[in-house]
């Protein structure tokens, strides 16, 4: 059991399981891309570890960029997505793969899809290491999912609770 601020968390998914899921997702994306050189777009802050490990596993040419949006305060989703940092390069005619750490309500994905719809991308794919199917009620297709998890708050591997826990190499769940 670990404590972050006022909450206690118990082990949930270990580092080996995370690495296996990311490797599996990287193979799936490689197979789907053919000769395309995708632009992987990580969603900060949470996805920095996922993106780092994903691109190390991805064996074909690719580009990497990041966007930063936020919809979390504490342990609850705020339902309002604020764009903080956008993209500088044109993505017109490119294949874009959004890499998320976690998708629960899907509000961030809706905001990102709207951003990319205006960019005239060739195709948009969505990858997430963690999906909370109970919370996800959007119509946007998720192309690559590492784990489906219960609708409980998790920390570690880039995910935080009010700033703490991102550096933990495995996933812990709220007790």
How would you label these PLM feature ranges?
Residues 1-175:
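PRPP-associated nucleotide enzymes
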């Amino acid at each position: 059991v670990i404590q972050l601020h006022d909450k206690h968390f118990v082990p949930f998914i270990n580092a080996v399981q995370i690495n296996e899921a990311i490797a599996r997702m990287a193979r799936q994306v490689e197979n789907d891309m053919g000769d395309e050189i995708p632009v992987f777009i990580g969603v900060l802050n949470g996805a920095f570890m996922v993106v780092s490990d994903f691109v190390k596993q991805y064996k074909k040419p690719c580009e990497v960029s990041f966007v930063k949006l936020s919809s979390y305060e504490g342990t609850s989703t705020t339902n309002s997505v604020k764009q903080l940092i956008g993209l500088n390069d044109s993505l017109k005619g490119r294949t874009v793969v959004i890499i998320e750490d976690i998708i629960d309500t899907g509000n961030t994905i809706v905001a990102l899809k709207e951003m990319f719809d205006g960019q005239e991308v060739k195709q948009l794919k969505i990858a997430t290491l963690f999906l909370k199917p109970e919370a996800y009620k959007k119509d946007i297709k998720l192309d690559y999912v590492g784990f489906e998890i219960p609708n409980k708050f998790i920390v570690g591997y880039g995910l935080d609770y009010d700033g703490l826990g991102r550096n933990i190499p495995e996933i812990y769940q709220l007790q």
